[in-house]
């Protein structure tokens, strides 16, 4: 995983998420106890994704393909970073993207941003746990000639397997192509967390 890309996503989270929280606090009207309870209830919603996976996929535009999917928990709870890589038969990379997922207790939802194209930080989405499934709605290709919206469902989730399915809209949600994209993932590595990029010590910042 490229360190500069990871640092960029972490800086984005540190700058953008507190500002969003400040804007939403009054409207949400939740006490600190309620916010803590929501956070504790949902901070592990994506724990099933942690670790390393091999996947097979079928897409109505690109056909059948496969690749690797890895996710790590960040130093702060309720934040997950994953990398999704599509590979060819000889191991060559055809597509690579990273997604930062962070739980927002003020809005009681997960918020996502995917980076994998020259269009910057525009592929935004939101997600919620629904029973035993995770549901996400996310935009892709924003700023390009063919933006689309995906309604994504993670289901049949187990310790070593999960299924992923998406409907797609190219007209802002007016019409949908059902089952446009399907993924089956099998675990090949255990869950893990990323080590903190910074470390506290007894010296105050700027004292060295």
Question: Model-found features: residue ranges?
Answer:
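Hydrophobic small-molecule pocket/channel-lining residues, especially in calycin-type beta-barrels
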Residues: 25-208
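Sec/Tat signal peptide C-region and signal peptidase I cleavage site
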Residues: 20-24
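N-terminal secretory signal peptides that target proteins for export/translocation
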Residues: 1-5
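Bacterial N-terminal signal peptides
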Residues: 7-17
């Amino acid at each position: 995983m490229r360190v500069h890309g990871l640092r960029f996503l972490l800086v984005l989270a540190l700058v953008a998420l507190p500002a969003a929280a400040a804007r939403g606090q009054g409207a949400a009207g939740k006490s600190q106890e309620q916010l803590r309870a929501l956070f504790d209830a949902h901070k592990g919603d994506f724990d099933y994704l942690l670790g390393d996976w091999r996947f097979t996929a079928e897409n109505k535009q690109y056909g059948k393909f496969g690749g690797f999917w890895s996710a790590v928990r960040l130093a702060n709870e309720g934040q997950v970073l994953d990398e999704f890589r599509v590979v060819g038969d000889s191991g060559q990379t055809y597509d690579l993207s990273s997604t930062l997922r962070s739980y927002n207790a003020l809005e009681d939802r997960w918020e996502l941003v995917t980076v994998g194209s020259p269009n910057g930080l525009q592929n935004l989405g939101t997600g919620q746990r629904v029973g035993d499934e995770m549901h996400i709605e996310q935009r892709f290709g924003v700023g390009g000639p063919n933006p689309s919206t995906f309604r994504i469902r993670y289901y049949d989730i187990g310790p070593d397997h999960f299924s992923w399915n998406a409907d797609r809209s190219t007209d802002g949600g007016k019409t949908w192509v059902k089952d446009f994209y399907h993924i089956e993932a099998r675990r090949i590595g255990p869950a893990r967390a990323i080590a903190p990029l910074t470390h506290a010590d007894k010296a105050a910042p700027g004292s060295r």
